[in-house]
Amino acid sequence: MTKLLAYFPSPPQGVWHLGPVPIRAYALFIIAGIVAALLIGDRRWEARGGERGVIYDIALWTVPFGLVGGRLYHLATDWRTYWGPGGAGFGAAVRIWDGGLGIWGAVALGAVGAWIGCRRHGIPLPAFADALAPGIILAQAIGRLGNYFNQELYGRETTLPWGLEIFYRRDPSGYIDPHSLDGVSTGQVALVVQPTFLYELLWNLLIFVALLYADRRLTLGHGRLFALYVAGYCVGRFCVELLRDDTATHIAGIRINSFTSTFVFIGAVVYLMAAPKGREDPESLRGNQYVEEEPAEPEPATVAATTEAATEGVAAPADGAEAAGADATAQRPEESAEPDVEKPESEETEAAEEASEPEAEEPEAPEAEEPEEPETEEPEADSGEEPEEESGEAPEQLVAEEPEPAPQQPETKRRWGARLRERLSGR
């Protein structure tokens, strides 16, 4: 009874078949961990000032690179299993769904993919890593459940009350082996071991909570939160490696992952101390896509239409004035030298008009005489103008007499002046 309450068993199998398609627990937990990391990372990225959805775009680079890097690290540190005497061969080396991912390779090559994605979006890689750090450690915790279903990465034999029972499994060919990934448990216990997968799972959950707390209290940025995650994970991984008893590469009697954890921990601590304090400017997290789209916002169709309408309203009086000036010039050549039609009474304009009239009065002399004949009050002015124009007398005498001899000119000026004022008032 005490044994049943103390030890906990391994799952009876780690793979199920949906027809010809195998459904592996290890792959399901890896996918679940990736989804959880992306969901948490996206929310954290938006909370820091970034644009929502960018995490998923960069994940298209990060996840494939991370999976390949994790597999390469596993093959490099456990090469005898595949290419040593009696090794599984190249076919087993590429079957990533059978298990075997090294977190250090996944983080290293995944960082390369993240750098490519961040560069394409114009956002800083350290800020992206800070937003994703808690999600990564949570994904690692979820992924350890896949090791539990595969009966792998366990520790040395133990008599502790929380020991893990490893069962013999029979594969479809009838071969019985506790390491069979496709087999089903026979119910016979092969050994009781340290549940190192559980130790690392609990440690990762503790780091996950610690990262969230530190990020809120200390406002870590510029990659410092990610460095804290790496340093914290290295401590736990170093301790777990001391308890593991599975096949691994050793250097001077020490597992290679222990060396890796030590060096990576030192690098993380150095970066944590050297990186800038505080957080990035939220505007720097928007990326180049947001900046490129921003100038288009203040130029909607309504603003353009309003600008055009205002331009037309201002240009209409000017156009009307230009058209009026053109018509008047075509009809009266002598008025081409009159720039201001609204001020016929000013002395300066009258002097300018009189100066220009002698040059253009010869063709219009009869026109000025026709309307003057029925008028009884202006014969003297007409007769006085003719000798003045012909003899070229001084313009002083014409200043006072100019409005009277040609009644058509002031009428035309008033007409165009009134029309111009109406258009300007309509503006």
Curated annotation (Swiss-Prot):
Entry GO CC: plasma membrane
Enzyme type, top EC level: transferase
Keyword annotations: Cell membrane, Membrane, Transferase, Transmembrane, Transmembrane helix
Biased composition (Acidic residues): 347-404
Biased composition (Basic and acidic residues): 332-346, 411-427
Principal location listed in the UniProt entry: membrane
Keyword field contains S-adenosyl-L-methionine: no
Membrane topology: Multi-pass membrane protein
Annotated disulfide bonds: none
Location(s), subcellular: Cell membrane
Pathway this chain belongs to: Protein modification; lipoprotein biosynthesis (diacylglyceryl transfer)
Record-listed E.C. numbers: 2.5.1.145
Region entry Disordered, spans: 280-427
GO MF annotations, alphabetized: phosphatidylglycerol-prolipoprotein diacylglyceryl transferase activity
UniProt-listed GO biological process terms: lipoprotein biosynthetic process
Residue sites binding a 1,2-diacyl-sn-glycero-3-phospho-(1'-sn-glycerol) per the record: 144
InterPro entries in alphabetical order: Lgt
Residues spanning the membrane: 21-41, 53-73, 96-116, 122-142, 189-209, 256-276
Compositionally biased tracts (Low complexity): 299-330
Domain of life: Bacteria
The family this protein is said to belong to: Belongs to the Lgt family.
Described purpose of this protein according to its UniProt entry: Catalyzes the transfer of the diacylglyceryl group from phosphatidylglycerol to the sulfhydryl group of the N-terminal cysteine of a prolipoprotein, the first step in the formation of mature lipoproteins.
Protein name: Phosphatidylglycerol--prolipoprotein diacylglyceryl transferase
Native source organism of the sequence: Mycolicibacterium paratuberculosis (strain ATCC BAA-968 / K-10)
